[in-house]
Amino acid sequence: MVLPFKHEPFTDFTVKENRKDYQDALAKVKEELGKDYPLVINGEKIYTDDKLISINPSNKNEVVGNVSKATKQHIEEAFTSAKEAFKEWKSWSAEDRARVLYRAAAIVRRRKHEFSAWLSYDAGKPWDQADGDTAEGIDFLEYYARHMVELEKGKPLADRPNEDNKYFYQPLGPGVVIPPWNFAFAIVCGTTVAPIVAGNPVLLKPSENTPVIAYKLVEVLEEAGLPKGVLNFVPGDPAEIGDYLVDHKDTHFINFTGSRATGVRIFERATKIQDGQTHLKRIVAEMGGKDTIIVDESADLDLAAESIVHSAFGFSGQKCSACSRAVIHESVYDEVIEKSVELAKTLTVGNPTEDNVYMASVVNQKQFDKIKDYIEVGKQEGELVFGGETDDNKGFFVHPTIFKDLDPKARIMQEEIFGPVVAFSKAKSFDELLDIANNTEYGLTGAVISNNRENLNRAQTEFLVGNLYFNRGCTAAIVGYQPFGGFKMSGTDSKAGGPDYLQHFLNAKVVTERF
């Protein structure tokens, strides 16, 4: 009997034994750094001379792994493999497919600290952030497995005399998964196993920044009994194979999480019908945000500061849900900023393999340079009240940074930075708080800190984001509890980790029989 879904608990690192276990996992992973990793096509491991070099962003002289790069010919072979695997995989019952995911979840759970340690090296995640990433991956495995078993039952329809109607789901066919680097296990896992448990083979092209941890997921699913050809691992340079994967006539869906620019490019290209294509491609896209926490005059100001600081600076602001803007009622504006600065001063910045580090590096030199440039923009547009320091001598470190007195239309109030930078702006009324909150092209997450029920009720419908939180931060959605996805240019509102997600990878079919 399968128990009801319940999210994976987070590790309490105040417990000495847990700290020791994580340190042991870090030591184990460190011994494995620098290895070569293959492509995986139809179960065959293929090593190439041309490789992605994955480095530790907190120690850029440390190579995490060398991952083989796929060519267009490899992509063709992977599609051939996926189409052949589809013939059998689609006929597996949902329960049998779900068992693969249950076994995979059990494998990861037994080795939880090991996977988290890989995230500390491959993605620069501090202990708690890495632990949460791994736990979320387990949640996706458990949640989607259960949900597919329910979906296989179909949906009830009305019947007429002498007529029977059935409504059920069938998989689409081979598709492409293009996940991000910031949740290098959780989102890679969720975006991959959702279409797989729905019956679709997948070509997985991981981020070039974090391909090693993605390969570890491939190993787990293979160990869990996933048939060859159902998951084909094809890392590579986006400029060389990205468009080719999206354009391919045999691509039935693209499951993408990443930047607005790449998401829009995928949308534009995927709508074009290629020679030999016999279907319309499904597009699932989560494309980032410019997320706002608003604070009215009735709010608990300590809670407001805590919500802003932890939402802005957790994992160095490298979350699409991160608080990048704080819009505060003018009567409490100065006090909220003062409390936020004092709290930010307590945050530790350092190597993520060390205990009690709150923030580590950002992911690479390009992102470091981008954030550094935005800090200079912020100095021109507002007043720097805390932070702004950067250091890329050993790793790509950016300290928590707070600006105040921004015009709501300023660049750092409108453009996604994806780093530890938060900008404060003031408003005279709740109407203006909402107007500013809604004045970007994004609509992913937001939060309202208020003790005014009327204001909270208004925000529920008028704050135009896919995930809205009251009296807490705007990050840390949990699978099955807060399905995740946004409005406007934040994406297709696919609600990952929710009851509607798997239908993106299924066709609904109706069969009517007359007696």
UniProtKB/Swiss-Prot annotation:
Keyword hit for NAD: yes
Alphabetic keyword roster: NAD, Oxidoreductase
GO molecular function ontology, one term from the record: 1-pyrroline-5-carboxylate dehydrogenase activity
PROSITE patterns: ALDEHYDE_DEHYDR_CYS, ALDEHYDE_DEHYDR_GLU
InterPro entries in the record: Ald_DH/histidinol_DH, Ald_DH_C, Ald_DH_CS_CYS, Ald_DH_CS_GLU, Ald_DH_N, Aldehyde_DH_dom, Proline_metab_enzyme, RocA
Cellular component, GO, one term: cytoplasmic side of plasma membrane
Pathway per the UniProt entry: Amino-acid degradation; L-proline degradation into L-glutamate; L-glutamate from L-proline: step 2/2
A Pfam entry, by short name: Aldedh
Keyword Oxidoreductase carried by entry: yes
Known EC number: 1.2.1.88
Similarity comment: Belongs to the aldehyde dehydrogenase family. RocA subfamily.
Name of the protein in its database record: 1-pyrroline-5-carboxylate dehydrogenase
Organism: Oceanobacillus iheyensis (strain DSM 14371 / CIP 107618 / JCM 11309 / KCTC 3954 / HTE831)
Encoding gene per record: rocA
